[in-house]
Amino acid sequence: MDKFADLNYTLSVITLMNDTLHSIIQDPGMAYFPYIASVLTVLFTLHKASIPTMKIALKTSKCSYKVIKCCIVTIINTLLKLAGYKEQVTTKDEIEQQMDRIVKEMRRQLEMIDKLTTREIEQVELLKRIHDNLIIKPVDVIDMSKEFNQKNIKTLDEWESGKNPYEPLEVTASM
């Protein structure tokens, strides 16, 4: 376990890999050498990082299958990103989580639509009642008996003495 965390050991392994590649490939001007070295470096780093992580995870976890599956999916996704692909590998658990999230969002939107349509129906009913109250109903004969200013009006025949009490009798002028 000490060798896994030892930086000198890691650097010496990388140097050994580079020396081996240089000895195998005699032509130093080869165009693919940097790419091969990069891929081997990434693979070596993944190897060094994943083995201790897997050992610790398997010892501490109760469900080793899920841990292994998660580690493999992560490694494959890393390799796909390094290769330039934008697609990712997903597990069934992730797909189910995304589907649950989508279904919850759809339910929330349906509830919102239901609330909005209920409010709109209530508003339309209220507007109809207001419209019905505001409609002018035509009346053929106007009944003026209920008007307050028409109650005490008397005709000439109804007056006691037969003459208009509001007409002045004499005209007097002040001097």
From Swiss-Prot:
Q: Which amino acids does the record list as binding Ca(2+)?
A: E120, Q123
State the post-translational modifications.
The N-glycosyl content is primarily Man(9)GlcNAc, with a small amount of Man(8)GlcNAc.
Q: Which UniProt keywords apply?
A: Activation of host autophagy by virus, Calcium, Enterotoxin, Glycoprotein, Host endoplasmic reticulum, Host membrane, Host-virus interaction, Ion channel, Ion transport, Membrane, Metal-binding, Secreted, Signal-anchor, Toxin, Transmembrane, Transmembrane helix, Transport, Viral ion channel, Virulence
Lumenal topological domain residue ranges: 1-28
- Topology of the protein relative to the lipid bilayer: Single-pass type III membrane protein
> A Gene Ontology CC term for this entry?
extracellular region
Q: Name one GO biological process term.
A: viral process
Record field: transmembrane: 29-51
Which ranges does the record list as Cytoplasmic topological domains?
52-175
Chain positions carrying an annotated carbohydrate: N8, N18
Query: MF terms per GO, please?
Result: channel activity; metal ion binding; toxin activity
> Where would you find this protein in the cell?
Host rough endoplasmic reticulum membrane; Host membrane, Host caveola; Secreted
Q: Which domain of life is it from?
A: Viruses
What Pfam families would the database entry show?
A: Rota_NSP4
Predominant subcellular localization, coarse grouping = host cell
Q: What does this protein do?
A: Plays an essential role in the virus replication cycle by acting as a viroporin. Creates a pore in the host endoplasmic reticulum and as a consequence releases Ca(2+) in the cytoplasm of infected cell. In turn, high levels of cytoplasmic calcium trigger membrane trafficking and transport of viral ER-associated proteins to viroplasms, sites of viral genome replication and immature particle assembly. The secreted form acts as an enterotoxin that causes phospholipase C-dependent elevation of the intracellular calcium concentration in host intestinal mucosa cells. Increased concentration of intracellular calcium disrupts the cytoskeleton and the tight junctions, raising the paracellular permeability. Potentiates chloride ion secretion through a calcium ion-dependent signaling pathway, inducing age-dependent diarrhea.
Q: Which family does it belong to?
A: Belongs to the rotavirus NSP4 family.
Free-text domain note: Binds 1 calcium ion per tetramer.
The subunit field of the Swiss-Prot or TrEMBL record says: Homotetramer. Interacts with the immature particle in the viroplasm. Interacts with host CAV1, early and late in infection. Interacts with host integrin ITGA1/ITGB1 heterodimer. Interacts with host integrin ITGA2/ITGB1 heterodimer. Interaction with microtubules blocks trafficking to the Golgi apparatus.
Q: What is this protein called?
A: Non-structural glycoprotein 4
* Annotated source species: Rotavirus A (isolate RVA/Human/United States/WI61/1983/G9P1A[8]) (RV-A)
Q: Lineage of this protein's species?
A: Viruses, Riboviria, Orthornavirae, Duplornaviricota, Resentoviricetes
